[in-house]
UniProtKB/Swiss-Prot annotation:
InterPro entries in alphabetical order: DUF1846, DUF1846_C, DUF1846_N
Domain of life: Bacteria
Protein name as catalogued: UPF0371 protein CE2832
Pfam families recorded: DUF1846, DUF1846_C
UniProt-listed HAMAP family: UPF0371
Family: Belongs to the UPF0371 family.
Species, as recorded: Corynebacterium efficiens (strain DSM 44549 / YS-314 / AJ 12310 / JCM 11189 / NBRC 100395)
Amino acid sequence: MRTGFDRDLYVRMQSQHINERREQIGGKLYLEMGGKLFDDLHASRVLPGFTPDNKIAMLEQLKDELEILVTINAKDLQRNKTRADLDISYEDDVLRLIDVFREAGFLTEHVVLTQLEDDNYQAMQFIQRLERLGIKVARHRVIPGYPTDARRIVSEEGFGRNEYVETTRNLVVVTAPGPGSGKLATCLSQIYGDHQRGISSGYAKFETFPIWDLPLEHPVNLAYEAATADLDDINVIDPFHLTAYGEKATSYNRDVEVFPLLKTMLEMLSGSSPYQSPTDMGVNMVGSAIADDEVCREAARQEIVRRYFKALVDERRDELDDTVSSRIAIVMSKAGCSVEDRTVVARALELESETGAPASAILLDDGRIVTGKTSALLGCSAAMLLNALKELAGIDPSIDLLSPESIEPIQTLKTEHLGSRNPRLHTDEVLIALSVSAAASDNARRALDQLKNLRGCDVHTTTILGSVDEGIFRNLGVLVTSEPKYQRKALYRKR
């Protein structure tokens, strides 16, 4: 895979720039970390060479000087919001993040629930769960007039109603499972609380996307717009930066909307603001570490198309209108890409048309496309997986990695003893069968050794995947899209 991003340069530059901002601010610094802090899979897809743990690697250089504060929007608990890339709820992701941060040696003791209301039963239950686990919880309330009514917000009737988090270090990283979690409001509330206690503190923002020093409609920035289409976030030219410096910089609507509040609040608390624009608040050095712009552009265009298919599937699965997919269609148009640019789509659809049954296609790293069709023994994704492993291992396509005799007993187990209606093997079942065969078969061993080479490959299926196949592909690091239709008609769908 071609690399478009210099990871080592980024780690050095970013940690240095954060330290420079700390010196500039003085006192305690609340650093809002946008995007995923530990496993930023979106960034790794649109910036080839950016590893999912890049931000943690950078923060490890500051580990002994910082603590991490995790926020979650209480309304996301009511909505049962999930992280699509990991298929876990935001509630569980909060616990997972705390575990990950602690295992890496970061001080992580507090969770802030934002936009909390007394009738939010799910949030109250989560608070009890956190407290039973020994995690300190701060409750931040819905503030009428936020973010426009600065005088009310910066008062006892606004931030004054929020519970204050007693932090112990001078660099506080504020992160969350996803966007819209209230990270900025948490930082501002803490600065207000510090001011009431005579503590000097300031704010800076580390948001990977949009990248401020790339053009507004650069595909990498547009991919972020596609990723947040459900929030109706849009990239904008920072009007405050343009006015103050006469320079164009890329920001996004929520930062621009809340900037007057931040500036007013800092002026109310300390007499002046160090920032003239939302862009000034940022410490993001990602743009400076892009080593090959065209590689990143193409990766971003592919991500936008993947987001489009995901939106279509979500709308079909959850019986939603086409609001999100329509927004992403507009983004695709801006980026100059379409579903035809995802080459596996046409191949999968062609095979489905030829066979009259669901089909799959995978694009290998060297450009070869391998397909899989539905048969009496295998589902199309399982067949495609075996075919891809044979191709990578240089095994003759006519050779069966799994004999019909080894598959049939598994089918009998499924249908006669485990209550399955579908006798065909799924991806997890063929991998287990392949692992068993590897004890006696050199071909099976060689095929299994190629699993690592599937990471980052693109797959398209002509029907919506079941949860098992979806999970296997996710664990293998395969980037899957599907047509927004089910293999069979039914009212009940197992999730």
